[in-house]
């Protein structure tokens, strides 16, 4: 074989430039960048060194051959022409990976089979034996990449991906790959800071990936020094003497690096479940003397108390993929920024995030930003210098010069964030509404009400108070609104709400309201299972602010529920599309002879059962699971008081067809009125803003619109929130 080879090094998208610099430093010549890869030329010693030392590559591929191909036969012939006896024993094992498509190969599995067949046939025809396929730890892993009609056939020298260093056997919910973590550290300037003897702190360290990678860089430890099996271990072209030389050189460098006084590298993690897994990872990496992990919140993490010590704070905060997370993340970023200003003066900071707009809430200007990809998710690395002239708030914090006493700042939650002009206007409106509505709510003994409903068009939110919790619903912005501006306004609003309403920031829950299809509005959005008890009109009800799009209590229907309570005494009450049966609880409280509640959702009927039980109601209150239309057609009972509050649109595997309130309301009301006893009353309401009641219903029934009577002061600003009618038999 030649003394020099063409090598391909693959990497995560966005790391090509960094990998090219690293590979040049390790001896790769003629380097060129490609998407998620670089290529160059090297001898075998350099190839080994790249495998051992690259902190950024995924794989090191040694190119065996390039050839043009027009079809599957060309693919077979090109691979079969290689003398595979130079690479693999006839009775050895192999795995094949195929990427790309075209030239008659539109299926990677088919392409891999053709490559495998060509190799097996070559060895069997020559040796009389054939290799077998082993996908996990083969003797040789062959890779073929098809690119615009050219096939690039390679051997994978790495084996398992090089990001798998072997120390991280335990990980958290959303870990960064080790090579991405190393890239972030390099971009953040950690090699320079470490060379100067600087410190490193990660206030949200998870299981310690940043910490271990940082320590390996500082200690001059090859990232894959402890790897025992490589892609070249059983390759017949392997040169053991050269490998031993490279490996022993790396061992000597690591021993020398670890013999130096360790740098101060600390991690802090709020989740106690991650502390021991993180410490185990550090121990497996052999870095227990260098890296320490402690349990602690962002607002309380302590960098080194030595005021002359400089260093890097690095963090990968959560991105907020789950519904309702964005509000809590806003305060997390504010906490992080406040802590940096309080305790890390003169340090540098690096925040790796999939939500860069939240980085603006830290109160520090980012002097440099880099684009990255975390898998398929676009991310940014925000770099900061923690010094007063970079503080957006203009704060100037001077070091305390007391004799040895360290001042510990108050928790961030107690220090209000400075609001932008728009956020202050929004806060003023909230406070004005709260002052007006608070008096009414206290008088009526109501502890759940709406304090804001898109009063200012640029802040398209609904803000509801549930005792000392706040439920925020963001209305979908029109397409004419710039999404970035809408996002900025949302973040402004979220920063203003805790101050204006006097609530704990951690008790603000954000939801996004948009047109819901099918049963999506009823689907579970999270799994916290956090129910809280609220009161209304003398009844106790359970709400859940986090797990579903709606909370279990439609606040706008409060007057209707109170009306039902007043009118229910001695009556048989029917609640259709009952949801969590809050109206049935009010009817039972009002002395109803019986209540029957019908809904398709088992989840909400279980919730309804809990609401009834919470108030001591059970025997006279039936809960029926079923499609309301089908249930009405089959039912022959009569009722004195009926309430119908249907969804605008609904479909389910458990119901026949699709329910559309505009199209189907006449049939629904006719079926329900057939179950109404003489002298009885039916209340019909819905929230479809374009709804029009069929005018022919007035010919059959006594129909009265009562919408204005069903709006309390907290919804008087939005008289289109719902419409309501009272129907009786003629």
Curated annotation (Swiss-Prot):
Its EC number is 2.1.1.173, 2.1.1.264. Keywords: Cytoplasm, Methyltransferase, RNA-binding, rRNA processing, S-adenosyl-L-methionine, Transferase. Residues 46-157 form the THUMP domain. Transmembrane segments: none annotated. It is an enzyme of class 2 (transferase). Pfam families: Methyltrans_SAM, RlmL_1st, THUMP, UPF0020. Gene3D superfamilies: 3.30.2130.30, RNA methyltransferase domain (HRMD) like (3.30.750.80), Vaccinia Virus protein VP39 (3.40.50.150). It is found in: Cytoplasm. CDD domains: AdoMet_MTases, THUMP_AdoMetMT. One of its GO terms (molecular function) is rRNA (guanine-N7-)-methyltransferase activity. GO terms for cellular component: cytoplasm. It catalyses: guanosine(2445) in 23S rRNA + S-adenosyl-L-methionine = N(2)-methylguanosine(2445) in 23S rRNA + S-adenosyl-L-homocysteine + H(+); guanosine(2069) in 23S rRNA + S-adenosyl-L-methionine = N(2)-methylguanosine(2069) in 23S rRNA + S-adenosyl-L-homocysteine + H(+). Disulfide bonds: none annotated. NCBIfam families: PRK11783.1. Belongs to the methyltransferase superfamily. RlmKL family. Specifically methylates the guanine in position 2445 (m2G2445) and the guanine in position 2069 (m7G2069) of 23S rRNA. This is Ribosomal RNA large subunit methyltransferase K/L. It comes from Pseudomonas putida (strain W619).
């Amino acid at each position: 074989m030649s003394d020099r080879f063409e090598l391909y090094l693959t990497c995560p998208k966005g790391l090509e430039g960094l990998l090219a610099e690293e590979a040049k430093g390790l001896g790769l010549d003629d380097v060129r960048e490609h998407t998620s890869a670089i290529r160059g030329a090297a001898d075998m010693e350099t190839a080994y060194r790249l495998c051992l030392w690259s902190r950024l590559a995924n794989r090191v591929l040694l190119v065996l051959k390039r050839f043009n191909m027009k079809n599957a036969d060309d693919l077979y012939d090109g691979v079969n022409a290689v003398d595979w006896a130079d690479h693999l024993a006839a009775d050895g094992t192999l795995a094949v990976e195929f990427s790309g498509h075209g030239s008659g190969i539109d299926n990677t599995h088919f392409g891999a089979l053709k490559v495998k067949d060509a190799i097996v046939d070559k060895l069997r025809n020559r040796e009389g034996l054939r290799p077998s396929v082993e996908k996990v730890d083969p003797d040789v892993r062959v890779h073929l990449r098809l690119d615009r009609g050219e096939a690039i056939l390679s051997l994978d020298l790495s084996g398992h991906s090089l990001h798998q260093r072997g120390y991280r056997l335990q990980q958290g919910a959303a870990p960064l790959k080790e090579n991405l973590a190393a890239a972030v550290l390099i971009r953040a300037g950690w090699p320079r800071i470490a060379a100067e003897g600087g410190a490193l702190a990660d206030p949200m360290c998870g299981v310690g990936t940043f910490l271990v990678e940082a320590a390996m860089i500082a200690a001059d430890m090859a990232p894959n020094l402890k790897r025992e099996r490589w892609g070249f271990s059983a390759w017949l072209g392997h040169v053991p003497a050269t490998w031993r030389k490279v490996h022993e050189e790396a061992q000597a460098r690591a021993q020398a690096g670890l013999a130096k006084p360790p740098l101060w590298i600390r991690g802090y993690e709020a989740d106690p479940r991650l502390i021991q897994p993180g410490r185990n990872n550090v121990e497996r990496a052999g870095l227990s003397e260098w890296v320490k992990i402690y349990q602690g919140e962002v607002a309380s993490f302590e960098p080194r108390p030595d005021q002359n010590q400089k260093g890097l704070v690095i963090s990968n905060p959560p991105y907020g993929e789950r519904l309702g997370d964005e509000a809590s993340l806003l305060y997390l970023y504010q906490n992080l920024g406040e802590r940096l200003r309080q305790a890390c003066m003169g340090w540098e900071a690096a925040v790796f995030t999939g939500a860069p707009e939240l980085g603006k809430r830290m109160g520090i200007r980012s002097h440099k930003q880099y684009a990255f990809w975390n898998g398929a998710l676009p991310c940014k690395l925000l770099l900061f210098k923690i010094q007063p002239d970079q503080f957006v708030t203009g704060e100037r914090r001077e070091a305390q010069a007391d004799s040895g006493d360290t001042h510990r700042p108050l928790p961030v939650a107690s220090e209000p964030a400075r609001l932008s002009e728009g956020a202050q206007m929004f806060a003023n409106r909230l406070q004005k509404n709260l002052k007006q509505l608070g008096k009414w709510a206290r008088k009526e003994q109501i502890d759940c009400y709406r304090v804001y409903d898109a009063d200012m068009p640029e802040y398209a939110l609904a803000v509801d108070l549930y005792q000392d919790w706040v439920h925020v619903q963001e209305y979908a912005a029109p397409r004419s609104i710039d999404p970035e501006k809408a996002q900025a306004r949302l973040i402004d609003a979220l920063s203003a709400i805790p101050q204006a309403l006097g609530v704990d920031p951690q008790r603000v829950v954000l939801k996004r309201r948009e047109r819901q299809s099918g049963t999506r509005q009823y689907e579970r959005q999270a799994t916290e299972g956090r129910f809280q008890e609220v009161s209304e009109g003398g009844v106790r009800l359970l709400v859940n602010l986090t797990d579903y799009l709606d909370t279990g209590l439609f606040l706008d229907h409060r007057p209707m529920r109170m009306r039902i309570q007043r009118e229910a005494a001695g009556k048989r009450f029917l609640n259709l599309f009952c949801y969590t049966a809050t109206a049935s609880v009010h009817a039972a409280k009002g002395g109803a002879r019986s209540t029957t509640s019908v809904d398709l959702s088992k989840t909400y009927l279980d919730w309804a059962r809990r609401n009834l039980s919470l108030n001591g109601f059970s025997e006279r209150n039936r809960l029926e699971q079923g499609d309301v239309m089908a249930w009405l057609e089959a039912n022959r009972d009569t009722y004195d008081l009926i309430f119908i509050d249907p969804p605008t649109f609904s479909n389910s595997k458990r119901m026949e067809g699709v329910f559309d309130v505009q199209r189907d309301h006449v049939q629904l009301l006719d079926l329900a009125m057939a179950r109404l006893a003489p002298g009885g009353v039916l209340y019909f309401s819905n929230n479809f803003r374009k709804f029009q009641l069929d005018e022919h219903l007035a010919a059959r029934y006594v129909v009265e619109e009562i919408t204005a009577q069903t709006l309390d002061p907290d919804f008087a600003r939005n008289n289109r929130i719902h419409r309501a009618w009272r129907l009786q038999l003629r």
